[in-house]
Amino acid sequence: MIKNINISNLIRACVVIMVLMMVSCEKYLDKAPEATITDQEVFGTFKSFQGFVEEMYHCIVDYTRSTYVDDWNIADEILATTVDWRMNVHFDDGDYWYWYTTATGWNQSYLYKDEGAITEIGTQQEWTMKGLWPLSWYGIRKANIGLANLDKLVEATQEEKDIIEGQLLFFRGFFHHQLMTFWGGLPYINEVLGSEKLDLPRLSYRETALLAAEDLEAAAALLPADWDNTAAGQATLGNNEQRVTKSTAYAYLGKDLLYAASPLMNKESTGNASYDEELCKRAAEAFYNCLYLSHTGQAFYQLTEWDRYHETFYTLNGEIPGYPESLMTPRYYYNEIGYDVTTSLHHPRILGGDGNMISPAHSYVKNFGMANGLPIDADGSGYDPADPWTGRDPRFYESIVYDGVQMIQGGTDADDFKRYANLYNGGNYRDDLGGSRTGYMLKKLYPNEGNNVDAVPNKLMLPGYMRLADVYYMYAEAVLYGYGTPQSSYPGNAGYVLTAEDAVNIVRARANVPGVDARYLGSQEAFKDEIIRERAVELMCEANIRFCDLRRWMIHKEMKYREKTALDFDRGPAGKPINMVERIVVTRVVEDKHYWLPLPQDQVTIYPEFGQNPGW
């Protein structure tokens, strides 16, 4: 009989592996005795086994919807309003315990939901009940149960067996990777644990990552490049875009290895705070394999065309965002369409928000360069401090609302007082308590027309965990530190040579931005600086990529990434800003201990040998 995965028992029984161990006498399916089904009925056919696997897709947390005013940006991108219960505020203050518990009793973190908040197993269609921490452990156990029962899959073709096994291996590696990125090396759980005494060792980051890499590499060999081109995928033809594929597995294999190769993780594992060259080469190979599938048309993933760029993050027609660029997104539940959880984050009260908006920090906005491809502080960039929003990188205009941008398209003359973004000092969009604190608003993830006048219908926001642009950047980084120069490439197929420089330029070209200037192509350090800036521009506010980047590069403590600033200014007669002053609003508290999140103390003390993360 299948064993129960009960999240309450899972969290308590887990000693420090936190939530891994389950009470073995629980039944997996909470059925009445007369409704009991056998293992063979669950695992015997492709259709029934795939139903078992489907739940793991629902363990992928939508990081934008932990609450109706979710704070997932915990690095240097944004400033929240001045209320003290925001997760962003606590992380700025160095209070990383806030991921796990809050003084207000209201857990705002997508990383954790306590056992009392999770209905049943927390994988049902209730996005506010999902937490990355418990559901990752749950997903790992579920994958192990599936792998332990593969021998029961008898009514299936070899293709169907491969697809089932590939998904199970992928999710086991993926969920371990999700946990590692925040909490470091962990035990790698590759079997179904019982109720016996727990003595699994905590591994180094490298050791954990290499075990995840084995699973992800095996998954890549088994999964299809495109489900629509398989017999198994015909039953869901045209609705397979969010399923994991060969490309997804290669992309996460590369990410897993690149993270393990990065300075922070390499130092934790070996004491050496530089890149691990061999792991970078392995990462480059995995990313290359992912990109090659798209290059040859075997996989459907492509960079979204520029005129549809916003559809990577939100749509206005009720369709799920992301296609064809996103490789990994959470599930979207259609009962959410009528509940607009994003207005409060993106718009001030005057446009229909509830006073809980986030605003991009001016210090972060300075990452956006000029239309000629140069950083704003580079010689010859053409940046004019007296006219700071003219001639910028096209991605600036897709991502940022600045003073004077038209927000309301319709309405009447009575709406003219708020038709344009009044973000100057004293403007009706500028308010520390209910509007912009910085002089900017975030446009990237939400349409300007999603206001209380235009009120565009059917707007869906769903930024994913990984998209193809990220793969290009990570490939460039892996090649740079695996093979030595921006002009280096992974030695793959002779018909597809891709240098590190090429990979970055492909993403820039999508936005009509010229290639990286020659002055940044002469050394690893110069090109790395452009990779850092490019990732800040292209991947802003996506899946805590920035938080992970700053930490893994070990630049988290540098003052330029700790100071969050606002731009104070008046609006001049010509509509241009005057009397501009950059003001430090927050200096983020970052010490050595802030390279990792603390582990739940109540669970660490149950298993002292496991150990808390340093400094916590």
Describe each region flagged by the PLM.
Residues 2-14:
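Bacterial N-terminal signal peptides that target proteins for export
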Residues 22-24:
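C-terminal motif of bacterial Sec signal peptides marking the signal peptidase cleavage site
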Residues 46-51, 58-64, 91-183, 197-232, ...:
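Conserved, well-structured interaction surfaces
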